[in-house]
Amino acid sequence: MRTVLLTGFEPFENEPINPSWEAVRALDGERVGDAVIVARQLPCVFGAAIDTIGELVDVLRPALVIAVGQAGGRAEMSVERVAINVDDARIADNAGAQPIDTAIVAGGPAAYFATLPIKAMVRDMRAAGVPASVSQTAGTFVCNHVFYGLMHRLSQQPDGDVRGGFIHIPYLPEQAARHPGQPSLAQETLVKGLRAAVATALSTRADVREQGGQLH
């Protein structure tokens, strides 16, 4: 049976919970087709987060890796297109580090694209009743850091057959209640969206060709 690794983050920036971890752990052990989902938590710490996901890839040998992170202020689940080779932290991570204009991998490529069928995933997430879109930026905090580190690691795999990517998700309602005016999605909606995303990523190699870009 194939393994799908889903990762979420520990809480950060004084939040008591992180919706990415709450959503992925709800899917831990669930079967999707011929695969089983394994959920693991990452530290919200530069360097350590990449080390942790790299160790998980080595131990679990998954067919698919989807890292998930919180994006407070976004109204939809955002399937990320690209990770860039820079850390530029607006706030400190959970270990107090705040790298600015620092390469994630010295001498590494400027960017990596997700190797998932991102547009097909968005299409099927929407078909399941979940607000979703393709995102053109994963930011420059620990989420992008992990996304880039993951894709760099996967690019070094001998068989090169492990696919990966990143999904940003909004606040949960209980978080939005502490941030007036901020959008949120219920946990059951987030779980439904991730389930649809995993199923499509497992069954689809070639992405659909349809509009998913933005003007700015």
From Swiss-Prot:
Compartments, as annotated in UniProt = Cytoplasm
Entry keywords, A to Z: Cytoplasm, Hydrolase, Protease, Thiol protease
Enzyme Commission number(s) of this protein: 3.4.19.3
Q: Which reaction does it catalyse?
A: Release of an N-terminal pyroglutamyl group from a polypeptide, the second amino acid generally not being Pro
GO cellular component assignments = cytosol
Q: Name the Gene Ontology molecular function terms of this record.
A: pyroglutamyl-peptidase activity
Matching entries from Pfam families are given as:
Peptidase_C15
Major subcellular site: cytoplasm
Broad EC category? hydrolase
Q: Where is the active site?
A: 80, 143, 168
* SUPFAM superfamilies, A to Z: Pyrrolidone carboxyl peptidase (pyroglutamate aminopeptidase)
- GO biological processes: proteolysis
Its function?
Answer: Removes 5-oxoproline from various penultimate amino acid residues except L-proline.
Family note: Belongs to the peptidase C15 family.
Tell me the subunit arrangement.
Homotetramer.
Q: What is this protein called?
A: Pyrrolidone-carboxylate peptidase
Which source organism does the UniProt entry give?
Answer: Cupriavidus necator (strain ATCC 17699 / DSM 428 / KCTC 22496 / NCIMB 10442 / H16 / Stanier 337) (Ralstonia eutropha)
